Amino acid sequence: MIKVKIVRLNQKAILPVYATAHAAGMDVSACLDAPVTVPSSASALIPTGFAIELPEGYEAQLRPRSGLALRHCISLPNSPATIDADYRGEVGVILINHGREPFTVSHGDRIAQMVVAKVDHVVFEEVESLSETARGEGGFGHTGVQAKAECL
């Protein structure tokens, strides 16, 4: 288990919590003095009222909640959003409304999930060429959208 320091910046803040024993992400709630309405095709930065101190070598990822995406077309445009170990400011959640109707966020609404993950730093080695693979440079849908016969 990893210890993460957390500071309540607003007395009304609801700290992140795992909803079930085996949940990968903690629910993150809005900390608002008044409701915020996100118009269709717009985004808004929603405060959480807390800041965290992650151990070196870890990050926190903010991810959309599936229920908000399914029922209201609400997502995070920079998903997963990264909170670096050296960031000490308030955690904010950028919500985007892909739906046709305005979406209102109230204090205490669960608006995102937070997953804490280990981060490995890499060192790039510049080379003249890369090794060959069967896939090569194929990307962006090069395998099609239909299931292959051996998968059916």
Swiss-Prot record:
Catalytic activity annotation: dUTP + H2O = dUMP + diphosphate + H(+)
Pathway note: Pyrimidine metabolism; dUMP biosynthesis; dUMP from dCTP (dUTP route): step 2/2
Keywords of this entry: Hydrolase, Magnesium, Metal-binding, Nucleotide metabolism
EC class name: hydrolase
One MF term in the entry's GO annotations: dUTP diphosphatase activity
SUPFAM superfamilies the UniProt entry points to: dUTPase-like
Cofactor(s) the protein needs: Mg(2+)
GO biological process: dUMP biosynthetic process; dUTP catabolic process
Binding-site residues for substrate, renumbered to this chain: R65, S66, G67, N78, T82, I83, D84
EC number(s) per entry: 3.6.1.23
InterPro entries linked to this entry: dUTPase, dUTPase-like, dUTPase-like_sf, dUTPase_trimeric
Origin superkingdom: Bacteria
Family: Belongs to the dUTPase family.
Primary role: This enzyme is involved in nucleotide metabolism: it produces dUMP, the immediate precursor of thymidine nucleotides and it decreases the intracellular concentration of dUTP so that uracil cannot be incorporated into DNA.
Listed name of the protein: Deoxyuridine 5'-triphosphate nucleotidohydrolase
Species the sequence originates in: Chlorobaculum tepidum (strain ATCC 49652 / DSM 12025 / NBRC 103806 / TLS) (Chlorobium tepidum)
Organismal lineage: Bacteria, Pseudomonadati, Chlorobiota, Chlorobiia, Chlorobiales
